[in-house]
Design a protein with these regions (language model features):
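C-terminal and inter-domain tail/linker signature
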Residues: 1-94
Length: 94
């Protein structure tokens, strides 16, 4: 099962997930920032770039045995850091 809570979509079944992902017309690129987890729960943080536009993405993957039982993905567009926080923060490479 693949869920996109932000758009309210749920895709069931491996073939449907494969077809849904293969049918996307955009050119995509993935840059993995980190993968953490253990046992039946793994989280991937990556930048998904569609046609040159980056989206910061978190993918939560739940396993049942050696198969993916559920993947939930969240997407966020980059934004300009406000000047009001500048004195407390340091800039990150993105």
């Amino acid at each position: 099962m693949l869920e996109y809570p932000q758009s309210g979509e749920r895709t069931r079944g491996r073939r449907n997930i494969q077809n849904q992902r293969a049918s996307q017309p955009s050119k995509k690129r993935f840059t993995v920032r980190r993968i953490i987890g253990g046992g039946d729960l793994w989280i991937t943080e990556f930048v998904l770039t569609y046609d040159g536009k980056p989206s910061y993405t978190v993918s939560i993957v739940e396993f049942r045995g050696d198969k993916v039982a559920r993947e939930t993905q969240y997407f966020a567009d980059p934004f300009v850091a406000p000047a009001s926080r500048a004195q407390w923060v340091e800039r990150m490479d993105t």
